[in-house]
Amino acid sequence: MTTKLIKHGSKAREQMLEGIDILADAVKVTLGPKGRNVLIEQSFGAPKITKDGVTVAKSIELKDKIRNAGAQLLKSAATKAAEVAGDGTTTATVLARALAREGNKLVAAGYNPMDLKRGMDLAVNAVVEEIKRSSKKINSQEEIAQVGTISSNGDKEIGEKIAKAMEEVGKEGVITVEEAKNFSFDVEVVKGMMFDRGYLSPYFVTNSEKMVAELENPFILLFEKKLSNLQPMLPILEAVVQSQRPLLIIAEDVEGEALATLVVNRLRGGLKVAAVKAPGFGDRRKAMMEDIAILTKGELITEDLGMKLENVNIKNLGTAKRVTISKENTVIVDGNGDKKNIEDRVLQIKSQIAETTSDYDKEKLQERLAKLSGGVAVLKVGGATEVEVKERKDRVEDALAATRAAVEEGVVAGGGVTLLHASQTLTKLKVENKDQQAGIEIVIEALKDPLKQIVKNAGENGGVVVGKLLEHNDKNYGFNAQDMQYVDMIKAGIIDPAKVVRTALQDAASVASLIITTETLIVDEPSDKEEPMPMRGGMGGMGGMGGMDF
């Protein structure tokens, strides 16, 4: 068993805070319209250049175990903000560092950490309510474009393309991002469908950074029943391996030996495969699988038609340009279905909607209709070099997630202004003791830090700007770091999604509370000698039929 290193009290927290400072210093330079780039060495290929806070945070691992524990806690705040709202990662990092550092000073001075936490929680909840009150719903294309522009670090073209994509497929529609084969940045609407079923095993993931399985030009097998044994499928699996194309299996379920065998062959490289459960239940499941079959020009393998798995060949499989599978959703893009057949299916569903008297059935039929006829908007991101394309694609994905958040919960004044003005409402809060009041004071001071950092990155004095803004009663009055002017942020189009600001604060406070209430830290003791790297097994399974193991 590995021996452990145990640290207690302020010494443990101080070392954790050193790790937090290292990560925060690397991330904070990216904040605001004049934030700087960060260059990250890759294990292979050219270095990555990014202005995305969470990408910077994810790249950092520290050698010292205790400092690394602090850095990883801070990283979790940035990652959570990105997962929930798609943006606000750098703001969450700056806030968490400020809250944790000030909180630790007070704990060292003898304040009760639990009361400090209670005071911080009271303050955060009050600010969240103020953010909700201040938020303004967005409807126009111009407002959507403004959010996309700001979330992509001032790239107006990205904002406009996202607004156009939402106009094409609706605000709730499916929008995906892919790399273009040329210099241009285009929006293309293609046949496609998304349903709420994810991969059956994380071992199907092909992109570990985003935890998604991406299948290019795959075959799609649609099977009505459960798959528990792959023996009847051997002929079709061998044919797919020979074609050197991926395979997506959609069935009622894939379980036991069948799932284990698919995973083993996926890991050995013999078969590029992923499996998902079919969407829906009962008769509705069968109807949705038939929709997918028509969309992809495949056949639903069902015993009703006397079809058996052992008799299936390549011609019975559907195809699509691309399939992306996350933990929760599957998106089929540009299925190769016949246009006339899809139109006929749409008309059939419309007639069923007209005939049904059940509101529930009508709702489910309308969902199917939207999936089949709505299409998928594809944002194709181009550039002069591979590094440029990847960096811009990251920003497009972040901006898209932030724009969806803005549509969901509305927008507030950007540039750190909403948090700054919200801090002024906290002076009226009533608490039980001076320690809780100190917790509120920590939050009041920390809420100034994002704006200070934006101003500092623009080359000005953050403290001076904060003082000037607090002299005004107008909650939308702020500092435009791009033009270096004091403006009405909403009128100037400098807006943030309310969900992004709210999530950044809540995640930051959560991490800071953990740090100031930590009294003991246990980590693995560093080893005196480096352990040899284990040899990677399973290489013999690569390629061709030799990779199959059924």
From Swiss-Prot:
The cross-references to PROSITE patterns, in alphabetical order and at most eight, read:
CHAPERONINS_CPN60
- The gene is groEL
- Please verify whether the record's keywords include Transferase: no
What superkingdom does the record give?
Bacteria
Keyword ATP-binding present in the record's keywords: the answer is yes
Record's PANTHER family?
60 KDA HEAT SHOCK PROTEIN, MITOCHONDRIAL (PTHR45633)
Q: Which UniProt keywords apply?
A: ATP-binding, Chaperone, Cytoplasm, Isomerase, Nucleotide-binding
GO biological process annotation, one example: protein refolding
Protein localization? Cytoplasm
In which organism is this protein found?
Rickettsia typhi (strain ATCC VR-144 / Wilmington)
Write down the chemical reaction(s) this protein catalyses: ATP + H2O + a folded polypeptide = ADP + phosphate + an unfolded polypeptide
Q: Which residues bind ATP?
A: 30-33, 51, 87-91, 415, 496
Q: What is this protein called?
A: Chaperonin GroEL
Q: What family classification does the UniProt entry report for this protein?
A: Belongs to the chaperonin (HSP60) family.
